């Protein structure tokens, strides 16, 4: 495929010398390279499988979301994505899909637009009741099979998510349950139990497909073909991989990015808001004044650190907290929430 071709949708082959790449840190860094460097004009799609890992959103507190001791003991990699969203466990029974769009970003924020090809493909494979529910979840009869996130950089965006095919759901529940003894306060969100794998829902010849074989079947439905060799594609070159490898070494593979810091401030308040997701505040108070403040959550947009800076020095009362939230442009940087709800969360 020529880089200058203007295609409505094409496949970006992320295999390396013909071999699938399962390293989650490498795979998670792909969208940044594809958007900022390669920048293929049009609508591209990547699809891959990760080795066991936990992916967290860019604004999440790893120490509050994940049992890090359990990860280390079980050789599970922690990876931070460049977009928002919640914490998810992935393994060889999970498929990741990502739309890489350069040029026309008019559908930014529209999860239904990027979910529809997946919904149509699953329906074509005989799975009934597939639909988008809420802001960014794909469900089958109210059981979650996919969560999506989105990030935009100038004239490009990445919009994608996961598909639970044959995921070890017991492992997922275990790894996303934080070690409460290591937290100074409670209030960590619970793991969503209403999830489902797709494999038990398939019938006939499809019922025993491996994850790789199911991924291939899904791609055939998405591109409306029985021969994937016939679809328009771009295959990553050695030059592409050299840049990706350097980015991983310099940034995406470092603990400073993936783990972040754990402020360990005394107060930790968290709540879930429909349409926005989880919002959490970690802060200290001295003599009735907020001295330290850190915002976490599932938010994909804005700059929560603006709220953090605005809250420091404000009085720990209704008026002071409201003033800090307003000064930090909380609706742009946290979500479209009533200020009374956030003030109540921080105070109570």
What name fits each language-model region?
Residues 50, 56, 66-72, 96:
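ATP-binding N-lobe of GHMP and related small-molecule kinases
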Residues 45-48, 88, 129-132:
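Short beta-strand
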Residues 2-63, 150, 195-202, 206-215, ...:
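Active-site loop/lid in soluble adenylation, ligation, and acyl-transfer enzymes
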Residues 17-18, 81-87, 103-105:
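A short glycine/serine-rich beta->alpha loop
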Residues 56-57, 64-66, 167, 172-174:
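Short helix/loop capping segments that flank catalytic or ligand/cofactor-binding pockets
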């Amino acid at each position: 495929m020529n880089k200058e071709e203007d295609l409505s949708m094409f496949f970006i082959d992320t295999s390396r010398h013909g071999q699938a790449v399962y390293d989650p840190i490498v795979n998670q860094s792909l969208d940044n390279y594809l958007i900022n460097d390669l920048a293929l004009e049009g609508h591209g799609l990547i699809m891959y499988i990760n080795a066991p890992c936990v992916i967290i959103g860019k604004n999440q507190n790893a120490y509050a979301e994940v049992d890090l001791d359990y990860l280390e003991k079980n050789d599970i990699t922690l990876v931070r994505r460049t977009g928002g969203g919640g914490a998810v466990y992935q393994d060889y029974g999970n498929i990741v899909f990502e739309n890489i769009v350069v040029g026309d970003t008019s559908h930014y924020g529209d999860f239904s637009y990027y979910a529809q090809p997946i919904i149509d493909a699953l329906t074509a494979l005989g799975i009934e009741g597939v639909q988008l529910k809420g802001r960014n979840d794909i469900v089958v009869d109210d059981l979650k099979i996919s969560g999506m996130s989105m990030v935009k950089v100038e004239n490009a965006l990445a919009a994608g998510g996961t598909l639970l095919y044959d995921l070890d759901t017991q492992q997922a529940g275990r790894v996303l349950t934080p070690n409460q003894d290591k937290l100074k306060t409670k209030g960590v969100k619970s793991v969503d139990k209403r999830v489902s794998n797709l494999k038990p829902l398939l019938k006939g010849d499809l019922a025993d497909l491996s994850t790789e074989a199911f991924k291939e079947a899904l791609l055939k439905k998405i591109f409306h073909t029985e021969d994937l060799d016939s679809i328009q594609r771009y295959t990553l070159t050695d030059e592409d991989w050299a840049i990706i490898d350097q980015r991983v070494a310099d940034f995406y593979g470092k603990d400073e990015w993936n783990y972040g810091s754990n402020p360990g401030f005394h107060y930790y308040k968290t709540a879930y808001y429909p349409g926005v997701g989880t919002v959490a505040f970690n802060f200290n108070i001295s003599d009735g004044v907020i001295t330290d403040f850190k915002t976490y959550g599932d938010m994909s947009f804005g700059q929560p650190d603006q709220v953090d800076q605005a809250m420091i020095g404000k009085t720990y009362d209704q008026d002071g907290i409201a003033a800090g939230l307003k000064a930090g442009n909380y609706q742009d940087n946290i979500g479209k929430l009533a200020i009374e709800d956030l003030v109540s969360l921080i105070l109570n």
